């Protein structure tokens, strides 16, 4: 995993965004999250437990605790009540992106380089739209996958432009769990050190 953190990238735009009502919700929620030091990952309206508005978010350093979920919920609830974008009752669910997270920013591909991802594209690339493989390189315009399943006649590596991406998600592996836990522990230690330094000033 790359040593790159999400700190300082809070205004980095998302590559994969919502459409329709979900887009309207994201437009309402995202400025509130930025204002309190969080980044929006995804918003979805789901037909589960009645109707559920699922909001995935994280701190700029990539962490998200239960207390953070409560803070986000309390910050966005009043704004949603005022804007009233949903014409029926719904349940608000705020969560972290999880270990097998959606990949929505360029920095996600840098941060999780070396891990397995599955993705879909909006256009054909090497005669396909669905890919699965290890992120071997992430650049400014796209990323390179080393496919773990190659059909006859296909190249092992494929470069996917970020502009062609329609969906991407990490695949849960033991290595991913280990690296995600290590990154979370490091981010929490850095936050504790920063809080300690702030207290001494």
UniProtKB/Swiss-Prot annotation:
Superkingdom in the source lineage: Bacteria
Pfam family of the protein (one): DUF150_C
Primary subcellular site in the record, as a coarse category: cytoplasm
GO terms for cellular component: cytosol
NCBIfam families in the cross-refs: PRK00092.2-5 (NF000932)
Family recorded in the similarity comment: Belongs to the RimP family.
PANTHER family: RIBOSOME MATURATION FACTOR RIMP
Protein function: Required for maturation of 30S ribosomal subunits.
HAMAP family per the UniProt record, alphabetical: RimP (MF_01077)
Protein name per its UniProtKB record: Ribosome maturation factor RimP
Species for this entry: Rhizobium leguminosarum bv. trifolii (strain WSM2304)
